[in-house]
């Protein structure tokens, strides 16, 4: 639970940024399906790149925190921090995808994506981040490694 806010905040930031970029691109009326696909892939690449960078940083700093401050052994520290880092990566990629697809969906339905997308993106990204984090903890730490 200690690192839940880190994952939630970063997923929210990435999703909101993807939302802003997508809404700006959707202002072009001549946007083709190919352009939308390219935008989606580009935003996922950005989310993945940011997720890798921040995930690695999270692994290092969380492991140091658990090892030095909490006094656990180094293997345990890196196992737990790896779970945090991977959850951060996964939630950032998924949030960037959602932040791109939701405004496209609203635009297709003839609803202004700038008005309708914000609260929905925030809620969905929070849910995705929490579910991703707890699923990783459940899969990696509890089921596979029997750490509780």
Explain the meaning of each model-derived region.
Residues 1-97, 101-113, 123, 136-148:
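Alpha-helical transmembrane segments and their membrane-interface boundaries
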Residues 114-118:
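Active-site-proximal inter-transmembrane loops
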Residues 122-133:
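Alpha-helical transmembrane segments that form the membrane-embedded catalytic/substrate-binding core
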